[in-house]
Amino acid sequence: MDQDALISKEDSEVEREASGGRESLSDVIGFLDAVLSSEPTDIGGDRSWLHNTINTLQRPGSTHRAKGEGEGEVSTSSTQDNRSGEESRVSGGTSEPEAEAHARNVDKQNIHWATGRGASTDSVPQDLGNGRDSGILEDPPNEGGYPRSGAEDENREMAANPDKRGEDQAEGLPEEIRRSAPLPDEGEGRADNNGRGVESGSPHSARVTGVLVIPSPELEEAVLQRNKRRPANSGSRSLTPVVVPSTRSPPPDHDNSTRSPPRKPPTTQDEHTNPRNTPAVRIKDRRPPTGTRSAPDRPTDGYPTHPGPETDATKKGIGENTSSMKEMATLLTSLGVIQSAQEFESSRDASYVFARRALKSANYAEMTFNVCGLILSAEKSFANRVDENKQLLKQIQESVESFRDIYKRFSEYQKEQNSLLMSNLSTLHIITDRGGKTDNPDSPTRSPSVFAKTKENKTKATRFDPSMETMGDMKYKPDLLREDEFRDEIRNPVYQERDTEPRASNASRLLPSREKPTIHSLRLVIESSPLSRAEKAAYVKSLSKCKTDQEVKAVMELVEEDIESLTN
C-alpha cells in the first residue's frame, strides 16, 4: 500500500511539472484534429434504453462497494457504466460477480495508465475520436485513459488470460485507485487532477497507446444495432451539465428523479434505501467547468460515433479526389481559363501539375507542399509575363523614336519642296507675262501673250491733289502703299496675288494701276525672302523704277545674292 501511494504521489508530481510545456501545444493540436474529424450524432438525445437494459442486471445484494462501509466507495464514470451495459447486452450477462469484473476493468485501466506514461501524442486523435468520455470531472487518476476496446474483446481477453488480475496486482499499482475514496475536486487536487484542466491541455489522451484496436466486424455490427435502437431525438440537446447514470440506475419509473434539473442534486434509489451509505452516483460540478471539453467533444452517450480520423480521412480522400478534380476542371472551363476538362488533366504546365497534385494529396503536409509549388509556379509565370511586357514596351518605344526621326526628316523635305515650288511659280509668271519672247530689247513695253479686246486708255486731266507731290511716281497707287503696311501678315503671296487685300477700300480698287503683273510677282518674291524689312523696301523701290528688262534682271540678281549670303 505504501509503495502504491508513493507511485501515485510521484506520478502527480511529474504530471504537475510536465503539464505546462511538454504536452500543452501538441496535445491541443491533436485534440483539435480529433474534434474536427469526429462527427458526433444525437448528443444529449434520449438514452432511456440505457436504463432499460442495465436494470435487468440489478441484484438486491450487489452494491458499488467492494469493501465495507468504512472504506469509502469507488467513483464510476459513464464510460464504465456504458461498458457494463454493453457487456450485458452483447454477451447476454456474465457469470462472474459484478464487483470482481469491475475491479478487473479498473486493473486494466491502471496497466494502461502505468505503461503509457512516456507515450507520444500520436494516439491523441484515436482516443479523442472515439468519444467515450462523458465530460465528468471526477475521473480516476488514470487520466481518463479507459480502454476503448469493445465488450466482446474484453470478455475474450479475460477468457484467454485468467491470471490477468494477478499480473495486475504484481505490477505494484496504486491500491487507492481501486479501493479508496475518490480524489478531491477542489483546490490543489483539482489542479493536479492528472491533466483534466485547460492548462495541461488534454494529456490523458497521450497516456494510452495501443488500446484502440482496429474495430472488428462483430463490434461494428453491435454499434450499428445500438445506433438503430437509439431514438433520433437530437433536438433536445442540453447545454447544462447532466447527471451521469450509475451502473445501479433505478427502474424506468424513477427516470424523472434521476434526470432532475442540474441545479438540484438528484435523489437516487440508493439514497432512498440506504441514506447512510455514501451514494454511488457522483454529481457533476454545478459550475460550467472551464477546463473540460464541451459536449460535442465528449458525447455523453459514450459510444464511438467515429471509427477514427486517420482511417476516415484516407477513405474520404480516395473518394473525393475524382470529384474535386472534376469540379475544378468544370470551374476552369466555365471561367474560360481552359477549353475543356481534358486540357486540365493532361496539361504539362507547372501550375496545372501542382494544382492536380494538390487536389490528389492525401494529407496536410503533401497538400501544403503542392500549394507552395502552385504559388511559386504562378509567380514565375507572372514574372515571365512581366518580362515579356517590358520587352514589348521597349520595342514600342524604339519604334516611336524612329517614327519621330522619320517625321522630322519628312517635314524638312516638305519645306524644301515648298520653297522650290514657290520659286518655280514665280519663274512661270515671269515667262507667261513676257509672252515667251526673250529677244526683244527694242520694244519699250512688254506685251502679254494673250491679247484681249480692250478700249484704249485715254489720258484724262486730273485735278491737283496735294498728296501727289509727296507720292512722286507712285501717285495713283494708294493700294500698294496700303498693302505694305500689312505685308508681315500675308502668309501665302501666291494667293495674295490673285486676291486683293480685303482691308483695302472699294474706292482704292477702282483706281487704275500702272504696275505690270511681272513687276508685281517679282515684288512678291522680294517680300517673301528672308531679307530685312529695310532691304525689302529698297529693292521694291528700285524695282518699281526699272524701265527695261536688263534693269529688272540686275535688281533680281542682287536680291538672289543677298538671299544666298543669308542662307549660307
UniProtKB/Swiss-Prot annotation:
Q: Which coarse location class describes where this protein primarily resides?
A: host cell
Q: Which UniProt keywords are listed? A: Chaperone, Coiled coil, Host cytoplasm, Phosphoprotein, Viral RNA replication
Outcome reported for the amino acid change (mutating residue 454 to I): In strain: Isolate E50cl9
Compositionally skewed regions (Polar residues) per UniProt: 50-61
Q: Which residues form a coiled coil?
A: 364-429
Q: Name one GO biological process term.
A: viral genome replication
Keyword Chaperone belongs to the record: yes
Query: Where would you find this protein in the cell?
Result: Host cytoplasm
Q: What is known of its domains?
A: The N-terminus consists of a long intrinsically disordered tail. The central part contains the coiled-coil multimerization domain (PMD). Forms a four-stranded coiled coil structure. The C-terminus constitutes the alpha-helical domain that binds to the nucleocapsid (N-RNA complex).
Query: Its family?
Result: Belongs to the respirovirus P protein family.
Any further remarks?
Answer: The P/V/C gene has two overlapping open reading frames. One encodes the P/V/W proteins and the other the C/Y proteins.
Could you identify this protein by its name? Phosphoprotein
